[in-house]
Design a protein with these regions (language model features):
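Oxidoreductase cofactor-interface core, primarily capturing Rossmann-like NAD(P)-dependent enzymes
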Residues: 2-33, 37-48, 68-69, 116-245, ...
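Conserved Rossmann-like nucleotide-binding pocket used by diverse enzymes
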Residues: 8, 61, 110
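N-terminal Rossmann-like NAD(P) cofactor-binding subdomain of oxidoreductases
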Residues: 28, 43-44, 51-55, 78, ...
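General small-molecule cofactor/ligand-binding pocket signal
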Residues: 35, 59-63, 152, 246-254
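NAD(P)-cofactor binding segment of oxidoreductase domains
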Residues: 70, 76-112, 128-142
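Short, amphipathic alpha-helical "lid/cap" segments that border enzyme active or binding sites
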Residues: 72, 198-206, 300-311
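A hydrophobic C-terminal alpha-helical subdomain
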Residues: 253-317
Length: 317
């Protein structure tokens, strides 16, 4: 199988797309073309950022992702497409996939799968936050021939940085407030959770591109930075901050489920986040084996560095 050579990235200036592009640029010489597809609005509001990217050898293609002709034109000469579209625009990937399969050039598509595993177990099919990703997967797997387009799902589990933050308006749903020295731990004391930093999402996507094998194509690659527990995270905060006293409470899984139901019934914007935290607390991030080895076992971040970064971030606020 041929490795990625000419790459097009959708959502490059978004939350995760930025980290993916940041991982690609230092090894720019290993690829032919690196292009991004961005909206006219972004072209107007992020001019300085796009100009900097152009100087780094990135092609900037301006268009609307719903404009078939614009997307077809962008696909010319591209063999690998990476989507980093956000949760609210996931369904737009179906058009991007259809056009990629019809293109004579595009051979590999990485949809926006960064985050919770949407096919972890039987219950996953009914989880509200998963529905758009499930539709995209169903289309890609059932409606598109592998003769026309290969795929890879880079499944990272929760982002470490976001997991650390208390859920706005629903603090019982877990997180850490470094300034207030307050922590809400989820689940039983020994309950593990697997996390991936946003920087490592970029690293893991890059290494997927560099390892085009039968194992990495047409499969879900469940990768991560590290596995820990809420109690270990708390202990690391206390260690780095000199053992200062914290206000620590714990939310049981049963209580988290109650909070989830209440959030959906009252229409709280944080409902999706609470559902995801319930899934993670149930163990929906844990595997007997990771796919990091299939993509070259890249160097990733650890708990100590993540906690240090969070402390540094908060100190600047």
């Amino acid at each position: 199988m041929s490795a990625a050579k000419n790459i097009l990235l959708f959502g490059a200036t978004g939350t995760i797309g930025t980290f993916i592009l940041d991982a690609l640029l230092p090894v720019r010489s290993q690829f032919g073309r690196i292009a991004i597809f961005t909206s006219p609005h972004t072209a107007k509001t992020k001019t300085a950022q796009l100009d900097k990217l152009k100087k780094q050898g990135v092609e900037v293609i301006i268009g609307n992702v719903e404009d078939e002709e614009a997307v077809k034109s962008a696909y010319a000469g591209i063999d690998t497409v990476i989507s980093a579209l956000g949760r609210n625009t996931l369904a737009q990937q179906i058009l991007l996939i259809r056009l990629a399969a019809a293109s004579k050039d595009v051979k590999w598509f990485l949809p926006s799968e960064y985050g919770t595993d949407i096919k972890y177990g039987p219950a996953s099919a009914n989880e509200k936050p998963h529905q758009q990703k499930l539709k995209v997967r169903a289309y890609l797997e059932n409606e598109i021939s592998r003769d026309d387009l290969d795929f890879s799902y880079v499944v990272t589990g929760p982002f470490a940085e976001m997991y650390l933050n208390l859920v706005p308006g629903i603090e019982e749903a877990g997180g850490w407030d470094v300034k207030a020295r307050k922590a809400v731990l989820l689940g039983d004391k020994g309950a593990e959770i697997s996390l991936t930093t946003m920087k490592d999402v970029g690293t893991l996507v890059l290494n997927t591109l560099l390892h085009a094998t039968g194992e990495t194509r047409n499969s879900a690659l469940c990768v991560n930075s590290f596995t820990t527990t809420p109690d270990k995270i708390q202990a690391e905060f206390e260690r780095q901050l000199g053992g200062q006293e914290w206000d620590v409470s714990r939310t049981s899984l049963a209580r988290l489920r109650e909070l989830e139901t209440e959030a959906w019934e009252t229409g709280k914007p944080a409902a999706t986040g609470v559902t995801l935290r319930r899934i993670w607390t149930e163990g929906g991030t844990l595997y007997a084996k990771r796919s990091n080895g299939a993509i070259g076992e890249p160097k990733v971040m650890g708990l100590e560095e993540v906690v240090a970064n969070e402390i540094a971030r908060v100190s600047k606020l």
